[in-house]
């Protein structure tokens, strides 16, 4: 059964992001968190050091206000500034709004994992979208 995180759990997660140096952008409307975006390591192996997996979340009360796009633009600029080569988005196949935003921002479809997750009493397919950048001028060998 899917369990929502408590405020304390989410705050600890935010703190861990800060401690690890991973970017975390929060969209605030009148003191209320309307959304956030972050990225972290795609895989915990040196060969993948230039690839990140991102997350973007917008509260349902703030859908269709352009918040996800604004947050994603911030993440993309941060990734470029940090020599990221590839940014990966892993999206529930049924989340067409997120897929459309990613496509609008230049992400391209790169694959599907069927039945990758189980949530809300059903199996979910996961689609991968990626955006490639120049990356580092002199990448380090793993």
What are these regions (language model features)?
Residues 2, 102, 107, 129:
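Conserved active-site tyrosine of GNAT-family acetyltransferases
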Residues 3-61, 72, 132-134:
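Acetyl-CoA-dependent GNAT
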Residues 22, 124-128:
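Short hydrophobic/aromatic beta-strand or adjacent loop that forms the aromatic wall/cage
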Residues 41, 88-91, 108-125, 134-135:
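Conserved catalytic-core motifs of GNAT/GCN5-like acyltransferases
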Residues 58, 64-81, 96-104:
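Conserved acetyl-CoA-binding loop-helix of GNAT-fold acetyltransferases
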Residues 72, 82-90, 94, 113:
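A beta-strand edge to alpha-helix "cap/lid" segment located at domain peripheries
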Residues 135-142:
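Acidic/histidine-enriched, glycine/proline-rich intrinsically disordered or flexible terminal extensions
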């Amino acid at each position: 059964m899917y369990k929502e995180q408590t405020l304390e759990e989410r705050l600890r997660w935010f703190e861990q992001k800060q401690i690890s140096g991973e970017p975390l952008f929060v969209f605030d409307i009148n003191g209320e968190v309307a959304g956030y975006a972050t990225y972290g390591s795609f895989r915990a192996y040196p060969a993948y050091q230039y690839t990140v997996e991102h997350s973007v979340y917008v509260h349902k009360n703030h859908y269709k206000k352009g918040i996800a796009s604004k947050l994603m633009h911030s993440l993309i600029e941060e990734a470029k500034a940090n020599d990221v080569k590839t940014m990966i988005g892993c999206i529930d196949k049924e989340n067409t709004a997120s897929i459309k935003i990613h496509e609008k921002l230049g992400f391209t479809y790169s694959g599907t994992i069927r039945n990758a997750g189980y949530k809300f009493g059903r199996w979910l397919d996961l689609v991968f979208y990626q955006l490639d950048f120049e990356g580092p001028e002199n990448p380090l060998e793993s």
